[in-house]
Swiss-Prot record:
Keywords (A to Z) from UniProt: Cytoplasm, DNA-directed RNA polymerase, Metal-binding, Nucleotidyltransferase, Transcription, Transferase, Zinc
Localization terms from the record: Cytoplasm
Matching Gene3D superfamilies: Homeodomain-like (1.10.10.60)
Organism: Hyperthermus butylicus (strain DSM 5456 / JCM 9403 / PLM1-5)
Main location class: cytoplasm
UniProt lineage: Archaea, Thermoproteota, Thermoprotei, Desulfurococcales, Pyrodictiaceae
Cofactor(s) required for function per UniProt: Zn(2+)
Catalytic activity: RNA(n) + a ribonucleoside 5'-triphosphate = RNA(n+1) + diphosphate
Family the UniProt entry places it in: Belongs to the archaeal Rpo10/eukaryotic RPB10 RNA polymerase subunit family.
A GO biological-process term: DNA-templated transcription
Protein name: DNA-directed RNA polymerase subunit Rpo10
Its job: DNA-dependent RNA polymerase (RNAP) catalyzes the transcription of DNA into RNA using the four ribonucleoside triphosphates as substrates.
Enzyme Commission no: 2.7.7.6
GO CC annotations, alphabetized: cytoplasm; DNA-directed RNA polymerase complex
Length: 66
C-alpha cells in the first residue's frame, strides 16, 4: 500500500503513524482523539493523514502496457 511518507506541506515524517492511525480509526475510535494521542499537532499533517485514500487497490486493476 502506498502510504503518506511525509507531510506534503511541512515535510514532517508521517509514515510511522499510519498503521496505528488506520487500525484505531477502523476500530471505531474518533480520528481527532487518535491524532492527538499520536502527537500530530499541525493541521497540515492532520489533513494529510485524514485525507489519505489507499488508491493502490484501484490502480492494480489495470494491466501494465509497455
Amino acid at each position: 500500500m502506498i502510504i503518506p511518507m511525509r507531510c506534503f506541506t511541512c515535510g514532517r515524517p508521517l509514515a510511522q503513524y499510519w498503521e496505528e492511525f488506520r487500525s484505531r480509526v477502523e476500530g471505531g475510535e474518533d480520528p481527532r482523539k487518535v491524532l492527538d494521542e499520536l502527537g500530530v499537532k499541525r493541521y497540515c499533517c492532520r489533513k494529510t493523514l485524514l485525507a489519505h485514500v489507499p488508491a493502490i487497490y484501484e490502480v492494480r486493476k489495470f494491466k501494465r502496457v509497455l
